Amino acid sequence: MYNYLLIRYGEIGLKGKNRSYFEKSLVKNMQSALKDLEIGKIKSTQGRMYIPLSGSSDELTRVLDRVTRVFGIETVSPAVKVESDLEVIKKTALQVFKNHMDSISPQNQVSFKVDCRRADKLFSKNSMEMNQILGAHILDHVPGLKVDVKQPQILLQVEIREDGTYIFTEKIPGHGGLPIGTTGKGVLMLSGGIDSPVAGWLAMKRGIQVVGLHFHSYPFTSQRALKKVEDISQVLSRYGTGPTGGFKLITNHFTDIQKAIQNYCSESMWVTVMRRFMFYIANRMAQKEQAMTVVTGENVGQVASQTLESMHAVSQDVVNLPILRPLAGLDKKEIMSKAETIGTYDISIRPYEDCCTLFLPKNPKTRPSLEQTKREISKLNFEELVEESLEKTEIKYFEPYQDITEEELTFDV
């Protein structure tokens, strides 16, 4: 039934002189998300974007699932576009209204409201007149209705524009934010836990093109632990659709570094020294990727390694880029809820431990000093261990919609 998808954006509309750059980026990202579907050209006009549809419900389901994951979009509406003729508008508005009625299967009397906006000033009727005409037409043809202008169960919206009239009843929320790629590139320190995927998602929401960096310690950590991270990367790829598409995961083989730390460093400092190595490698990877930031899933005070003293000790002097910690102000419950929304939670709780979990000492140092950390690292051949680790790096790309099943689609239209 629906032949267009209306796209509304929020923050992009406030960008002033740079607005066109953000709008073009949003269009490119939507095109990237829909590249394997036979979709017509996306149009942009008068603060709206329009995606043409064939009218197939299967197509609408797929397009909605993908478009609502693209950052920068505030809401979307499946709409029927018709010529701006009064009788055609009346007939179509009634069809759209009945279609929505059928989808909600009301048990009691239904309240409704018509909200018409006339952007085309050459149209013969004004907005108020159209509200009255369409409201009366619906009341005449659908029994058991009542008008409620404050809290209607069904809001029929009509936009009369220069290129035609758009009729719809739904505003489906997107995730807002900024189009990916508009604010730069970052390297995400990605574990298999709950936190780091959410941190990466939040960085993406602010327009950052994220590259994942995972530290793998085979055989201490299993291939199933790595598969867990790859599955998380697959989920993130569906949100990370920027102009280049997909999600890039860099896997750094960290085993030899962890062995050296375990053999030569004080047990209470294992985590601190290990994380300092990780930050140094992340900084090197960021430089190689021409990224401008390192993103982590650290929170403040959530675990022993996340005190302010510890954060200072693990990153000071080894990272010369901004470090983003999007979760710093969130409670664990909030992070878990967001992980469920994103779709990474069920993957993250699989019982396969990552390299940080396996090497936890009995009594970790919670407030290590930078000097103490440097003394521990001086026991190791830091540069040699790092270079050997970098030589064992692997890269894998994840396409956002490869092998997607019907059950994974979000919308049932």
Curated annotation (Swiss-Prot):
Gene Ontology CC terms, in alphabetical order: cytosol
THUMP domain location: 61-171
GO molecular function, one term: tRNA binding
Compartment(s): Cytoplasm
Residue positions binding ATP: 189-190, 214-215, 275, 297, 306
BP term (GO), one: tRNA 4-thiouridine biosynthesis
Keywords of this entry: ATP-binding, Cytoplasm, Nucleotide-binding, RNA-binding, Thiamine biosynthesis, Transferase, tRNA-binding
HAMAP family: ThiI
Protein name: Probable tRNA sulfurtransferase
Species in which this protein is naturally found: Natranaerobius thermophilus (strain ATCC BAA-1301 / DSM 18059 / JW/NM-WN-LF)
Taxonomy of the source species: Bacteria, Bacillati, Bacillota, Clostridia, Natranaerobiales
